[in-house]
Amino acid sequence: MPKTRKYSTVDEEKILKVSLSLATKEDVLEWSHGEVTKPETINYKSYKPERHGLFDELIFGPATDYKCPICGKKYKKSNEGLTCNNTPQCEIEKPEILPKISRRSRMGHIALQTPVVHFWFFKIDNSIISKLLVLRVGESNEYVSKNDLENIIYYKSHIVLDNGGLKSLPKNKIININNAAQIYKDALIELRELNLNDADALEIIDGTINHLNDIVGSKVGNDYGVDFYELNEVIEEYSSAKIQTGSKAIEFLLENIDLEEEQRKIKSKIKEINNLEKTSSSRKQDLSKLYKRLQVVESFINSGQKPTSMLIYNLPVIPAELRPLVQLDGGRHSTSDINELYRRIIIRNNRLRKWIELNAPTLITQNELRMIQEAVDALIDNSKKKPKPVTSKDNRNLKSISDALTGKKGRFRQNLLGKRVDYSGRSVIVVGPELKMNQVGIPREMAAKLFEPWIIKELIDQEITLSVKSARKLIDNLNPIIWPHVAKVIQGRPVLLNRAPTLHRLSIQAFEPVLIRGKAIKLHPLVTTAFNADFDGDQMAVHVPISDEAVREAKELLFANRNILGPKDGEPIINPSQDMILGIYYLTIEIAGAKGEAKVFQDVNSMLRAYEEGSVSLHARVAIPFKKLQKTFNLKGDKGYIFSTVGKFIFNQAFPENFPFIFDSSVSSISDAQEYTKKYYIPYGLNIKETIQNTPINDALSKKDLSKIIRTIFDKYVPVLTKEDVASVINDVNHTNYKDTSTKFANLVTTNKTALEYIHAESLSKFTTKHFVDVNKKLSLKTPGNPNQPIWEVDQYVELLENVWFDYVNIVASVLDEIKDLGFKFSTKSGTSISIHDIEVSDNKKERIKEGDDYTSELKSMYREGLLTDDERYSLTINKWSEVKDNIQNDLKKIVKNNPLNPIFIMMNSGARSNMANYVQLAGIRGLMTNNTKILKSDAENERVVRSTVEIPVKSSFLDGLTAYEFYSSTHGARKGLTDTALNTAKSGYLTRRLVDVAQGIVVTEKDCATQNGFVVKDIVDNKTKTVIVPIRERIEGRFTIEDVKDKDGNVIVEKDTLIDAKMAEEIVEVHDVKEVNIRSILGCEAKNGVCQKCFGKDLATSRIVSIGEAVGITASQSIGEPGTQLTMRTFHSGGVAGVEDITGGFGRLTELIDAYRSPWGRPAIISKVDGIITEIKTPKDKNTNLVYITYLDQDDASQTEVVSVPKNRTLRVKVGDKIVKGQKIIDGPIILEELLEYGGPRKVQSYLLKEIQKIYRMQGIAINDKYIEIIISQMLSKIEISEPGDSDFIIGSLVNNLDFYNTNNELLEKGLEPAKGKVVIHGAKRIPLLSNSFLAAASYQESAKILVNSSISSQQDFLVGVKENIILGKKIPAGTNSQYESKSKFDIRDPKEYFKDKSPQRHYKIEMDNEVSDMFNEFRISQNK
């Protein structure tokens, strides 16, 4: 693609890279279509743009399509690009015929009378100009500061550019109002000495000196200073000195800088400092400054740009439509702030031109020059302008160009990363229990608007109306004639539903629209969990995918029935809840001695009839001959019976025939169906009644049991073939073999390279037979001739494939729909209701409370006697009341167990609503309440007792009613809960945004990176409590091994490069008791620009190996950020002590880790700097410290001792004789990450971060997979700071991606050159996006100006690797269906017609038919086609 710096209409997909560089004055003229010389906008009478003004139609394009801006003649579209010659004026001006959209792209310019320094280059990132120049005053050690340069730019100070041999005027000396008189005086005296022989010169110089002396002592001199310009003139007249101010001075300095020489000097200074044996902190600062300066200098050298490009000579005027003037009612106008800022520049520029022409006094001209500089500054970045920004009449800061870029409402985030979408609507949602899982109810009126173009086409095709206009009128008037056509049009056109906030990818899913009356969208009740929706007024947005590719993506990837598992932990996210659970629980309750118990029915239908007649109870256990049940039991003997409750027989009808029968809640054992069923099998001849009565009652199925059943169904019926595989069988189906396809399906190989299980082949065969008959029937109605065997074309094969494929992938969803229907039906039938009398209370409550009161009064008397401190008394009181509440809770648990049919307990036990904690407050005691306290960092550091709990508990329950004091006491906690939730939501959203920016570019890019770096995993254990946080079994499942896994005897259990599934993981851990496994990990992956399949392992949302093209980085960020709202902000108090433990849970600690804080909350841990053995722990007398002695071997294998001093009041984590490794804690507390990195190395930091982040989430009961946290951690440690560049092109002090670093070093070593040296550095999530290789991605995150400034001076190129930069350009993102995916993978969503290329519509395949007429008819059709 040709390189262009002009606005161009290029196909986005052809853009390969974008570069950003400084615009020269020639560039601006090339962009411009004319100079703006007047500050006017539009004429107040005619409302037409003024000529040469800010909205001039000749410069910026016409306000009306294809209309000449001069004579007003209208042209056709075909004349676009020509010029109008209608009038003599037109012939002179040559106006181009253009559409009005050109006003969004055509630019103008203002030719400034003086160059202006670009605001960003002396204000942003500590002034690029200042870093570049670093001016030294003469031969002294004094340097020109950043502020001095600013004073020059704003004409407050002057600078000596050339001393002309005058010693009193050293080069680069700054002359300001304070020191001017003395400097000029010394200079004039020296000048006098040099001009003793020139009488005229002496006279003028003496006169000037006398005048200077007069002014210095006078009031005028003190108030206004000296006249710089007059004195400069005299000095410049009689010497070759040069003193200047303003942008001209800066221009001179930038023109005369020798970049190569500067580069050489900086490098030698760096070498000098590095060669010193000891470097002090001030030297380190100098080094840091030199590195930064070197980067700026090398940026200019490498990009080949001139430093003077940082000055503005011609100021671009952005297109008129991007700074619009909007007409309001009443003849008033509202204008964009940018127009006001441009007007100020034009007015000042015109005035300056006038002063120059009139040869006005220098002071007046100088003032105008300063004002122009300030006006351009305000246009570029008004918010940073000092002393105060330009304001409007109502004292509001005007929005400049920088302000329009940054922030949530800026160009990047408002217009480029998020756009408004056509063909969309939104409405309130209501529940739609009658819908199938892949359906959504769309209001008719909404559908008529959303699908308008398709409806118009259909109406015209059916000759209901003849024109688009009349069709649109029918739709707008909602004419009843349109509804059948609306229903026809929406068939096979899915819609996307989105609920804000879109916290994870399941917040957008696709559904098939179903027309409904009313104005609310009907949502399927099972998908509410994924959307986090409820029906209390939530709204949802609907979008219509338009292109064929988008429709296929929606059906294959976004359909709700394809998103059963949640990506964060791989568990089903589509689980029945509330009413449905209550219904299923009620349906599966067993009651001994219920009506009709032990009855025998001949089959399920006769049992159902008896139930409907009321002769048998739903909860009675009855028997049915097992031969009559359509279930595969694999039991010997054929005359026995199966017994269960009527309800369970009904419940089991929801499952496929080849799914085991569910008898009880031991769901995990149904995989071994034979053993499981034996318990409920009565062999022929046994007494049925006795057997049933002697069998213990089973618990009903609760929420947890249902969850396990759904997981089992998913694992059993999830599609294991690709669409291409199914198409290969359907391609051979015809009228003779359509009933017998099971063998062909059974011969297919699954995606896991195993043989297809029989249940899959059987299901597919059944679907094929069913749909073949349907499609054939449909076709025979259309086809005359032989109606039984019509000729199939490619469309019929596609239809058959689509129907069979949909049924195959919908098996799990259809079972869930059945469960949902049963749940709703039987929760209604149960008639569950609760009353105040259903709340059962404990008889022991008063005794328990009395016990607490007695204990606390005893503590008070001990405190009064001085046996306890107040803090100890408080802590013991809190502990006692917690114990009392626990005892009352245990009493209530017994009551719940003894009354299983109480409606409240049914709700609790089933998991439909509420839990024990709620019931304790309802029927027992409310307990302790939170207090209004703030924990300070000093409290945590000094481990003070913080009284965050009111020590007098609320002794009443809600059933008793609270006293006035108790009610007041509980208000603080109740309000805190609500405010915390609100604050948490915002914080969690911001965290997700930061994480997405960190990981957005990480996509699965290749199969295998062949890395040798594994990651050893074992149980994550909380060392304090010795509890397992994440078991090893969970950590290794779904990961590849990097080496053979062996048992204790050295026998190989799992070979290298094997994906560990759930069974293997169980075998490794439970059977062979392996404690640690070396696996492939993202932390060791060497794939460029992403990760490889083997290092990532299993995709949790599909339970298969992750597909190439999967945007795992964004999934990871969403998985960590989405549950963020559930993380508490409250801190856990162990007996009220504000220690480190307070923050181990909750949001604060998570932010602290992810942002890599330098000083974590609480007192940090002390870690070992060496690998050794603890030989001694001493406590010196009269000291508050312990001395820990560690013996270790140094580099020469000599024994050394390291003494670590630790505070006495801290918990030691080591004892004498312990082995200790680098980075291990000596005392408790949070570890400082940078310290751990320095002593323990990157691997230790990775393990520590992983453990700590998992700890935070698991404490709240949230399961997140390791691999997502690994992605974020790998990004945090992905940069290397260069200390010595060797023979590479790296710049000292720069940050380089670790893979680039290692690859460059390998290349250098192969060539025998010196490699670069550097150290790994850790960055928090706030910093990482700013270090991105893509300037577009970085600038759209934060600090836009700084990123753009640094990118432009180095002429940086963005190769569009990540997701964000492609979205900004409007390109397809390099992930998913636009990635280099493999054939037959998740993203291989091609047009189904491609599977039937041999069945093209042009050639009909004559199927053998008996009917002669049909033969003739077909021959005729074939000859016609030929």
From Swiss-Prot:
GO biological process: DNA-templated transcription
Gene Ontology cellular component annotations, sorted alphabetically: DNA-directed RNA polymerase complex
Cofactor binding note: Binds 1 Mg(2+) ion per subunit.
Entry GO MF terms: DNA binding; DNA-directed RNA polymerase activity; magnesium ion binding; zinc ion binding
Binding-site list for Mg(2+): D534, D536, D538
Reactions catalysed: RNA(n) + a ribonucleoside 5'-triphosphate = RNA(n+1) + diphosphate
Enzyme class, UniProt record, top EC level: transferase
One Pfam family, short name: RNA_pol_Rpb1_5
Gene3D superfamilies cross-referenced by the UniProt entry: 1.10.132.30, 1.10.150.390, 1.10.1790.20, 1.10.40.90, 2.40.40.20, 2.40.50.100, RNA polymerase II, clamp domain, RNA polymerase Rpb1, domain 3
Keyword set, alphabetical order: DNA-directed RNA polymerase, Magnesium, Metal-binding, Nucleotidyltransferase, Transcription, Transferase, Zinc
Positions that bind Zn(2+): C1009, C1085, C1092, C1095
Domain of life where this protein originates: Bacteria
Cofactor annotation: Mg(2+); Zn(2+)
Annotated function: DNA-dependent RNA polymerase catalyzes the transcription of DNA into RNA using the four ribonucleoside triphosphates as substrates.
PANTHER family recorded: DNA-DIRECTED RNA POLYMERASE, DNA-DIRECTED RNA POLYMERASE SUBUNIT BETA
Family of the protein in this entry: Belongs to the RNA polymerase beta' chain family.
Quaternary state and interactors: The RNAP catalytic core consists of 2 alpha, 1 beta, 1 beta' and 1 omega subunit. When a sigma factor is associated with the core the holoenzyme is formed, which can initiate transcription.
Protein's recorded name: DNA-directed RNA polymerase subunit beta'
Organism the protein comes from: Mycoplasmopsis pulmonis (strain UAB CTIP)
